[in-house]
Amino acid sequence: MPIQSTIFGLSGLSLTKSEKAFFRDANPWAFILFARNIKTPDQVKRLVNELRTCVGRDALVFIDQEGGRVQRLRPPHWTNYRPAGDFAALFKDNPTAAKRGVYLTMRLIADDLRSLGITADCAPVLDIPVPGADDIISDRAYGDSPKSVIPLAHAAMAGLASGGVAPVIKHIPGHGRATVDSHKALPHINTRLQELELTDFAPFNAFSDAPMAMTAHAVYTALDPNNPVTTSYDAITNFIRARFGFDGVLMSDDLDMKALSGDLTTLTENCLSAGCDIALQCSGVFPDMIKIAKGARACLLYTSPSPRDQRGSRMPSSA
């Protein structure tokens, strides 16, 4: 089986027999871990090795380790890192100290991840929250303006990269203006394109050379009034690819989120056909994983055993 254009989560602290068989057959491009998969450093190392053994290669292993509310590795075994919002506040008084603080924080996070064999972090958040928006982003953001978000995100990416961990910018082209949480419902954003390009879209445009990005499950009426970004050819291919010039690996946000509706197999096909390289499925719910894999089989994008042979000229080695 060629490498499939998917990233899968899993159910627990170790692989079940069914998961092992599924991963061997589906051959996903990468894996992602959550708090339910994490107990101790030694246990995580064993799990990461199990995952790579299933696919017979050094597949990338992802995690969300932003600091603040979103960090899967927590005390007592790991440090509880500050949220991005703390550095945004510091930036107002001392930009140099804020940038240095972000760099060092993400460098330490990279050390934590690499020690476990985890090679990609779904961070930094480039979204810019606005008054009245849902608080799903809030202090996960590096401020309320591109003037702080861009330099602080640059420091975050540099910190991760210097520790050998690949950053994933999110949620392209922006989620900060959403008035509902896309884990629960589909946001609709009706702001004019000219305003978006000066605000929400500016950080993503600035990092068009990033190695990886994750989509926003949101409808931008200025880009496509009928489809969320994740399944929109106009938003992904005609705007993110053509207008931003983003040529890195583009992964969806979790296809199991409530923002998206419909059959998971069809959603996967639509996501990949729209221009996403990778369909992400996080829940570890086995029937859902089977549906995602079925959809991806119809849209195989990767046929080489190395992600570096594809869009990934800027991708890290997993080893």
Where do the language-model regions lie?
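A charged helix-plus-loop insertion that forms the helical arch/lid used to bind
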Residues: 77-96, 141-143
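N-terminal hydrophobic targeting/anchoring segments and the immediately downstream early-domain regions
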Residues: 1-61, 65-77
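Second-shell residues forming the walls of enzyme active-site clefts
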Residues: 8, 15, 36-54, 59, ...
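Glycine-rich, aromatic-flanked loop segments that form ligand/cofactor-binding clefts
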Residues: 54-79, 105-128, 157-173
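Short, acidic/polar
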Residues: 13-22, 106-109, 263-268
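Conserved small/polar residues in nucleotide/adenosyl-binding loops
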Residues: 302-309
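Glycine-rich anion/phosphate-binding loops
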Residues: 40-43, 92-108, 147-151
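Hydrophobic alpha-helical segments, chiefly the membrane-spanning helices
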Residues: 313-319
